[in-house]
């Protein structure tokens, strides 16, 4: 056909009367809503002028004494205001936390004031420190120190432990530290010593004594090594 002038032009599509459906998440986010929400952080500046980053959480387990819910930021501000009643400075916090008996008394006093195990565990989540020590919660809220994972803390402490304990003691302390890393600071409680010895030595306390010395010596080793987990130089090099 001499008059043919090419393929017919398709008509332009008519615009939809409905707006385009929005992407359910931002472009860079392709994870479940709960995971995305967990990553959202907000900056909280406390009375010392230093900022802390906390997870944005819609629901927390914090409550005012009158039973009304409390936000994570309000709880952090309350804890920050109360901590000077328990220790005067960072050095005193480290000293109290470095021994099982004084640490237990500190935790007991905190619980009496409304800062119990459940609340402290919740605060661990909020500052994204679930793999850290409860010490890190207190040090972060009180002094804005960056949390350090239990694994890193244990790894750095082993250097000091190798200089202060014999080989058999080091083997046992490595075993203790593995439980500390996996479970938490409660594995360093004094009442956990005997269960840990039984676990390590297959229920034979006699074997433990043969390796580690008299019971009082074992107790001193167990309590004495813990200060190396909380030295300032460990925190200074996260």
Residue ranges and their predicted role:
Residues 6, 10:
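Acidic/histidine-rich catalytic neighborhood
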């Amino acid at each position: 056909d001499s008059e043919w002038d090419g393929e017919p032009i398709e008509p332009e599509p008519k615009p939809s009367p409905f707006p385009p459906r929005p992407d359910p998440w931002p472009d860079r986010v392709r994870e479940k809503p709960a995971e995305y929400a967990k990553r959202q952080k907000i900056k909280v500046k406390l009375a010392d002028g230093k900022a802390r980053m906390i997870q944005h959480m819609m629901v927390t387990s914090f409550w005012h004494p009158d039973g009304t819910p409390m936000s994570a930021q309000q709880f952090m501000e309350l804890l920050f205001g109360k901590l000077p009643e328990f220790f005067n400075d960072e050095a005193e916090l480290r000293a109290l936390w470095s021994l099982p008996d004084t640490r237990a008394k500190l935790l007991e006093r905190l619980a009496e004031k409304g800062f119990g195990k459940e609340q402290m565990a919740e605060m661990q989540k909020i500052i994204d420190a679930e793999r850290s020590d409860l010490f890190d919660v207190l040090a972060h809220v009180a002094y804005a120190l960056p949390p350090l994972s239990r694994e890193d803390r244990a790894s750095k402490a082993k250097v000091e432990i190798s200089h202060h304990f014999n080989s058999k003691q080091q083997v046992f302390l490595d075993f203790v530290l593995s439980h500390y890393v996996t479970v938490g600071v409660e594995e360093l409680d004094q009442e956990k010593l005997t269960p840990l010895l039984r676990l390590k030595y297959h229920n034979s306390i006699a074997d433990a004594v043969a390796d580690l010395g008299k019971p009082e010596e074992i107790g001193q080793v167990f309590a004495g090594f813990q200060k190396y987990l909380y030295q300032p130089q460990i925190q200074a090099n996260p």
